[in-house]
């Protein structure tokens, strides 16, 4: 029997607290693709932020998955503390080792690149190997064996966020 999804208390109050949405499921093996865009979030840095994000990660844990982190339009107000980033890395390492296939970073800005460089010193190499900076988006997404339909779903979401309103 499948476990019911946990509800994030921050998202219950404000659906824009976090950005962690299920985009697609790979037809080939059931791997789910989740999308995060920090520029779309409204939750401020707080002690509860890590616990709330862990709820979303727990809900992703039922099948293999890929996490797309889109850094488009990120400003300083969207960055997180290294404590938060390290907490997410520890959670992924402890609870998602066999099921998180890749973390695809779109438009990796300087802060994200520095955070990843710092994390390399403190997390296991197998987590670092899962990071894909998609500077050449199509090539990188095809390299992790996504179909064109799945790539289009990611790009549609990405360009909707990147395009001026």
Predicted segment positions?
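Basic, amphipathic alpha-helical/coil surface patches used to engage anionic, phosphate-bearing ligands
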Residues: 1-165
């Amino acid at each position: 029997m499948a476990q019911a999804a946990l509800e994030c208390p921050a998202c219950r109050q404000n659906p824009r607290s976090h950005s962690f949405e299920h985009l697609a499921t790979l037809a080939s093996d059931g791997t789910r693709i989740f999308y995060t865009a920090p520029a779309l979030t409204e939750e401020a840095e707080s002690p509860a932020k890590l616990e709330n994000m862990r709820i979303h990660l727990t809900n992703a844990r039922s099948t293999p998955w890929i996490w797309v982190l889109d850094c488009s339009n990120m400003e300083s107000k969207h960055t997180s503390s290294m404590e938060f980033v390290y907490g997410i890395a520890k959670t992924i390492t402890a609870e998602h080792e066999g099921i998180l296939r890749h973390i695809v970073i779109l438009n990796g800005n300087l802060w994200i690149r520095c955070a990843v460089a710092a994390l390399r010193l403190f997390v296991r190499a197998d987590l670092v190997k899962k990071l894909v900076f998609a500077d050449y988006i199509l090539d990188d997404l095809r390299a992790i064996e996504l179909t064109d339909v799945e790539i289009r779903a990611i790009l549609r979401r990405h360009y909707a966020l990147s395009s001026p309103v």
